[in-house]
From Swiss-Prot:
<comment type="subunit">
    <text>Component of the cytochrome c oxidase (complex IV, CIV), a multisubunit enzyme composed of 14 subunits. The complex is composed of a catalytic core of 3 subunits MT-CO1, MT-CO2 and MT-CO3, encoded in the mitochondrial DNA, and 11 supernumerary subunits COX4I, COX5A, COX5B, COX6A, COX6B, COX6C, COX7A, COX7B, COX7C, COX8 and NDUFA4, which are encoded in the nuclear genome.</text>
</comment>
<dbReference type="InterPro" id="IPR003204">
    <property type="entry name" value="Cyt_c_oxidase_su5A/6"/>
</dbReference>
<dbReference type="GO" id="GO:0046872">
    <property type="term" value="F:metal ion binding"/>
</dbReference>
<keyword id="KW-0496">Mitochondrion</keyword>
<dbReference type="GO" id="GO:0045277">
    <property type="term" value="C:respiratory chain complex IV"/>
</dbReference>
<keyword id="KW-0597">Phosphoprotein</keyword>
<keyword id="KW-0832">Ubl conjugation</keyword>
<comment type="pathway">
    <text>Energy metabolism; oxidative phosphorylation.</text>
</comment>
<keyword id="KW-0479">Metal-binding</keyword>
<keyword id="KW-0007">Acetylation</keyword>
<dbReference type="Pfam" id="PF02284">
    <property type="entry name" value="COX5A"/>
</dbReference>
<feature type="transit peptide" description="Mitochondrion">
    <location>
        <begin position="1"/>
        <end position="41"/>
    </location>
</feature>
<dbReference type="GO" id="GO:0006123">
    <property type="term" value="P:mitochondrial electron transport, cytochrome c to oxygen"/>
</dbReference>
<comment type="function">
    <text>Component of the cytochrome c oxidase, the last enzyme in the mitochondrial electron transport chain which drives oxidative phosphorylation. The respiratory chain contains 3 multisubunit complexes succinate dehydrogenase (complex II, CII), ubiquinol-cytochrome c oxidoreductase (cytochrome b-c1 complex, complex III, CIII) and cytochrome c oxidase (complex IV, CIV), that cooperate to transfer electrons derived from NADH and succinate to molecular oxygen, creating an electrochemical gradient over the inner membrane that drives transmembrane transport and the ATP synthase.</text>
</comment>
<comment type="similarity">
    <text>Belongs to the cytochrome c oxidase subunit 5A family.</text>
</comment>
<keyword id="KW-0408">Iron</keyword>
<feature type="modified residue" description="Phosphothreonine">
    <location>
        <position position="141"/>
    </location>
</feature>
Amino acid sequence: MLGAALRRCAVAATSRAGPRGLLHSAPNPGPAAAIQSVRCYSHGSSETDEEFDARWVTYFNKPDIDAWELRKGINTLVTYDLVPEPKIIDAALRACRRLNDFASTVRILEAVKDKAGPHKEIYPYVIQELRPTLNELGISTPEELGLDKV
């Protein structure tokens, strides 16, 4: 059905009005010009979980990261269909601390809670794993700030 619609569009686009206003259709394309279904997104190599984690930890551990890069990284990370590993969140929180960006720390923790969705055991696990970092950096969780009740 889609192939027929695409062929109709191609014929309509290549039709021209002749000198007397008559429409002349384009020549019928041969089998070599047939529309092929190609999955262009599946040709790349897949990234392992360890490589993914290392890439993001390295990104957030850059000593010269600025506020824009931090927010861009957080926004990109949140768009993935996963809950980031605690070591990635740890690196992001440390980058926030280097930039003195407390609002982003709260945003990261809220995003982790949101990404956990209905799986209520994930967020407490992440907070438990991050507790030493949170204490070291002086970061309060959204629950400690009372933001979960707003």
